[in-house]
Amino acid sequence: MAREKEMQEFTRSFFRGRPDLSTLTHSIVRRRYLAHSGRSHLEPEEKQALKRLVEEELLKMQVDEAASREDKLDLTKKGKRPPTPCSDPERKRFRFNSESESGSEASSPDYFGPPAKNGVAAEVSPAKEENPRRASKAVEESSDEERQRDLPAQRGEESSEEEEKGYKGKTRKKPVVKKQAPGKASVSRKQAREESEESEAEPVQRTAKKVEGNKGTKSLKESEQESEEEILAQKKEQREEEVEEEEKEEDEEKGDWKPRTRSNGRRKSAREERSCKQKSQAKRLLGDSDSEEEQKEAASSGDDSGRDREPPVQRKSEDRTQLKGGKRLSGSSEDEEDSGKGEPTAKGSRKMARLGSTSGEESDLEREVSDSEAGGGPQGERKNRSSKKSSRKGRTRSSSSSSDGSPEAKGGKAGSGRRGEDHPAVMRLKRYIRACGAHRNYKKLLGSCCSHKERLSILRAELEALGMKGTPSLGKCRALKEQREEAAEVASLDVANIISGSGRPRRRTAWNPLGEAAPPGELYRRTLDSDEERPRPAPPDWSHMRGIISSDGESN
């Protein structure tokens, strides 16, 4: 309770000093209170309480201003200001004060009224002395803004941010009002002039001045008004950025990011409005006299540019999908996906083009016109070219895919196994085996394989049998080849290895009638020993042939 009382006293004393409401925000009040109380931060409940107290003080200020309006009515009547359709005494009083100060405080407005009115009236006041019609127009605009500003004040259920918009309404409300009719500035100007002429009955001197001003310095005043509106738009943007920063701080506490998106939309509308104004100003400088044409062009420039920008984007997306269709195997379904993707890109390009300058819009329009002029025959040629390209690419793609296709398709064709051996992975493993110093008959080794996966597994097994460990590489293969050559050399030099080893089969004797193969050790010993120790073979037995052949040619 003590802290709440302290906050209440602080807000009362703070608003008694009449602060500048056009730049005042909740975060500024919070910082001032922290500096006043000497604390580093506030709790969320304290922040809400401080917001509520600030809103109460603002409502009290409005009540006090309503009481002081009646006193100021006499002053504005004495100042001989022309009566306006919406004669707000508070606005009249402020205009009187600003003119008495001779426009010196245009940038820092008086603090007797809400900031939405003050910003408009203070910036338009130097032009009012030269052109009373402009003054009446500014007053009408501000009266519309006040009507919109009073709505959130009447609704007590709305959030504190929306009430803050109502009190500091210029930063939020004015872009929305202008968004409703961005290209109808000249129409509102005419209406304002007609109403001001009907209402101005008494001063004859002022009407004469108006006629002179209209005849002599019409173009100069219009250019001045345009420059003033540009300054207003710049100030609006600055204030919008400040309000966005506050919203970010508050949203970080609450976790709600919706207001920021709203303010971004308003900033877009303000930029669109500024681009329309620049167009209309350029046309006036060039000397376009027809005001109706200006209205039509300004009103339809945004919509037409958005509408005309669609066909080139769609055409580009169609060409892209046609080119992609030849490269891919499944054409129609992926074309639909591509066209679906093309729509959001078209929307995004439309948004960027709206935010861009008028030169970008004109270049887009020229491009669209050139595309539409070059339509018909050239477009058909383009489509024919793209279809030819896609058919060519489809042929090459189908041939390569058939080479890498399923094993069933390969089994039905002649020489399909040979094509499988040309697979890059198979060729690489063959090169590794060759680098290891081994030579294999791949026709026998890979003849029974149906797919390149089987070939790869067989070749990897061969590499492992040769002694390859891990992923094969040419460096490992060279090292393995050296090891194998070294082992072969050692084996050839080892005598015991030669005798016992089963190398290439050699023919030791022409024919052994006994059918007994002599052991290899016996053969080696026979060559080393002397002739005496060699066993003699038994003499042949010819007894069974004695009756057939006799030595003397006679038979018994």
Swiss-Prot record:
Residues 168-177, 260-269, 385-396 have a biased composition (Basic residues). Residues 64-426, 502-556 are annotated as: Disordered. Histone chaperone that carries a H2A-H2B histone complex and facilitates its deposition onto chromatin. Phosphorylated by CK2. It holds the Pfam family CHZ. This is HIRA-interacting protein 3. The modification Phosphothreonine is found at residues 84, 358, 471. Residues 64-77, 126-158, 209-224, 304-322, 523-536 have a biased composition (Basic and acidic residues). It comes from Homo sapiens. Residues 99-108 have a biased composition (Low complexity). The modification Phosphoserine is found at residues 27, 87, 98, 100, 125, 142-143, 159-160, 196, 199, 223, 227, 289, 291, 330, 332-333, 357, 359, 363, 370, 372, 530, 550-551, 555. Residues 240-254 have a biased composition (Acidic residues). Widely expressed. Isoform 1 is predominant in skeletal muscle. Isoform 2 is predominant in liver and heart. Disulfide bonds: none annotated. It is found in: Nucleus.
